[in-house]
Each structure stands twice: as structure tokens, then as C-alpha cells.
A protein has these predicted regions:
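N-terminal secretory/membrane targeting signals
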Residues: 1-24
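Extended, low-polarity transmembrane helix blocks
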Residues: 6, 21-135, 145-241, 257-268, ...
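Extracytosolic (periplasmic/ER-lumenal) interhelical loops and adjacent juxtamembrane/interface segments
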Residues: 248-256, 260
Length: 349
């Protein structure tokens, strides 16, 4: 019984540990702290993970992750998994719809708060800010309602481009927005939208219909890029920023580990999850894990909800529309299934 309690307690701490990976430091720290952190660079951010005093914990965590993913891969080869996949994909249209609502709501709420895509990106910093705020508000309403969605998305792309000109490569952190904007420009939104009444299912450019299968991959790949870049640029390149979060929220009381170790582990976790989403490996499991710990982070650090709407929207969409033709899962799972069948046939002989 004591061992069981010990294991459960360890898993609880492990879950909380992973939630730190999805704490968005720009929402948790004040602007002065975040700006100061960007000026400080880390020499060897992964070194704490190989500290002899913590190597055992690192090995245990790695073993747990490998085991969970191994079980997931094996389950994915079963008939039950295939049956569940078909059931889930029957509501595939819900995914893009949720993302559209999330983008529209995020842009609208952000505009009312002098924020573009995220709290740290001030609209006031951009030229013609008052006019821009009005344009963003109108664009957000058009996207949310799904009226002339392609046109609204073109405006959104222009706004994203303008922000990139002033905020530079930091905008890669919000490549998830770019992915959805591109998809809306190409394919619009014909589900529960005003456009569906005006144009039915017809696209503005009908020839783009043949590329509709790229809708999910575009969103997924750019979402993965956003996570990978956030992990690298903040938790690795500027490790003092997550360390500030560690100190600010007294996380030492929760973890028996240094701020450097937790920051490095959180960074590696976010990087791995971003990479798995990018290549489409164990997509449903990976996105579900991300969704759970994103929620835990949101609750514990009391972050603003609206910047996370698009993250939740994309996550739910990727869970529903998992295993597209440009994912590793699409090829890897059938290959594993065949290998298992071969082994079973050999065993029978």
C-alpha cells in the first residue's frame, strides 16, 4: 500500500512538473521581468539534467515516458483503436470550427485589451494603433461569425505581417495563429458560418478544393513549430526567464530540485511535444498530454484565458483529426501492425 501511495505521489509530482513546461512566462511575469530575461543568455541549459545527483530522476521520468508511448503505439495497432478512430473522425468538421471561433474570440478580446495575439504584444507599439485596433476588432468578428472569412483572414495575415516587422522573430512563438490564418485564406469556413448560407460549400477559388487535405497538416506543422521555438527561445536560450517563474511561485516547495533542473526539464518536455506534433507521432496521446498540462498550468499560474483559446481549439482539432497523410503515425502504425502479425504467425508455427 505504501509503495502504491508513493507511486501515485510521484506521478502527481511528475504531472505538476510537466505543467510547468506549458506555463507561458510572458503571461506569468510582468513586462519588466520578461524583458530583462530576454537580455540574459544561457550557456549550457541542458547541463542540469545530467547532474549526478539528479540523473536517477531523469532516467525514471524518461522510462515512464517511453513506456507510456510504447503502450500507446501497441494499442494504436488494435481493432479497438481503429474503431475508436473512425468514431472520432465522424465529427471532423468540429475541429476547424472550434479553431475559427478561438481565433476570432482571441483577436477580439485582445483588441479590447490593447493586445495583439498575446498580452506582451501591444497594439500601441504599432503604427496607426487606433485604426489598427478597429480593423482587428472588425476582422475578429468576421472570422468568429464566418462572414467573408477568406477576406477577413487576408486582413489578419496583413496584421500578422505588420507585427512581425516590428516584433521580429519572436512572432514565431505565435506561428499557430499563422497556420490557422493561412488555412482560412485558402479554404475559408463553410461549417456553421454565414458563408455557408451565402456560398454553401463553394470556395472562393474552386481549384483549391483539391488541396483541402492540407488543412490539418498546415495547422499541425505550424503549431509544432511554435512550441519548438518557444521551448528553445525561452526555456533554453533565456533560461533565466523560467527560473524567475520558479522563484516567483516558490516552486522549490513543490520540487526537491534546482530551478535550473526544472527549467531544463520543462524546456525539453515542451521541445519534445512540439517535435512530436510537428512530425505527427502518437498525435492523439501527445496533444492530449499537452492539453492536460496546459490546463493545469492555466489553473496553477492563474494565467489569462483568452491567449490560450487558440491553443485549446487547435489541440481539440488535432485530437479529432489525427493521423493525416503527412504524419509519421499514418505510415508507422500500419508498419508496426504488419510486424506484429508476422511475429504472431511465426509464433503459431
Amino acid at each position: 500500500m505504501r509503495k502504491l501511495i508513493g507511486i501515485l505521489f510521484f506521478l502527481f509530482l511528475f504531472s505538476f512538473y510537466l505543467s510547468v513546461a506549458f506555463a507561458h512566462e510572458a503571461y506569468v511575469l510582468n513586462n519588466e521581468q520578461f524583458t530583462q530575461g530576454l537580455k540574459e543568455f544561457s550557456a549550457n541549459p541542458l547541463a542540469p539534467l545530467f547532474d549526478p545527483s539528479k540523473i536517477q530522476i531523469s532516467i525514471i521520468i524518461t522510462a515512464i515516458v517511453v513506456l507510456v508511448y510504447l503502450v500507446n503505439v501497441l494499442f494504436s495497432t488494435t481493432k479497438n483503436a481503429a474503431f475508436l478512430d473512425k468514431k472520432i473522425k465522424k465529427i471532423s468538421v468540429i475541429g476547424p470550427f472550434l479553431i475559427r471561433l478561438a481565433v476570432g474570440a482571441s483577436l477580439f478580446i485582445g483588441a479590447q485589451s490593447d493586445a495583439l495575439f498575446a498580452p506582451e504584444l501591444s497594439i500601441s507599439f504599432l503604427p496607426f494603433s487606433e485604426t489598427l485596433e478597429i480593423i482587428i476588432t472588425i476582422t475578429s468578428i468576421m472570422i468568429f461569425l464566418g462572414i467573408f472569412t477568406e477576406v477577413a483572414a487576408i486582413f489578419a495575415l496583413c496584421i500578422f505581417t505588420l507585427a512581425t516587422f516590428f516584433y521580429g522573430q519572436y512572432m514565431i512563438t505565435y506561428a499557430n495563429y499563422l497556420g490557422e490564418i493561412i488555412v482560412l485564406i485558402l479554404f475559408g469556413s463553410r461549417f456553421l458560418s454565414i458563408d455557408s448560407i451565402l456560398f454553401r460549400k463553394k470556395l472562393f477559388i474552386s481549384k483549391l478544393e483539391r488541396f483541402k487535405h492540407l488543412e490539418v497538416p498546415i495547422v499541425r506543422i505550424l503549431y509544432g513549430i511554435a512550441l519548438i521555438y518557444a521551448a528553445y527561445s525561452i526555456k533554453f536560450l533565456h533560461q533565466s526567464i523560467p527560473m524567475m517563474v520558479y522563484d516567483e511561485y516558490s516552486l522549490k516547495q513543490v520540487f526537491n530540485a534546482s530551478a535550473e533542473y526544472i527549467s531544463a526539464g520543462a524546456g525539453l518536455t515542451e521541445l519534445t511535444i512540439g517535435l512530436f506534433i510537428f512530425v505527427g507521432f502518437a498525435q492523439r496521446l501527445t496533444v492530449t498530454i499537452m492539453l492536460i498540462f496546459l490546463t493545469l498550468s492555466l489553473i496553477y499560474f492563474k494565467e489569462l484565458v483568452w491567449p490560450h483559446l487558440i491553443l485549446f481549439g487547435i489541440a481539440i482539432s488535432l485530437i479529432i483529426n489525427s493521423g493525416d497523410k503527412l504524419t509519421l503515425d499514418y505510415y508507422f502504425i500500419p508498419w508496426i501492425r504488419k510486424r506484429i502479425q508476422i511475429l504472431k504467425s511465426i509464433a503459431k508455427k
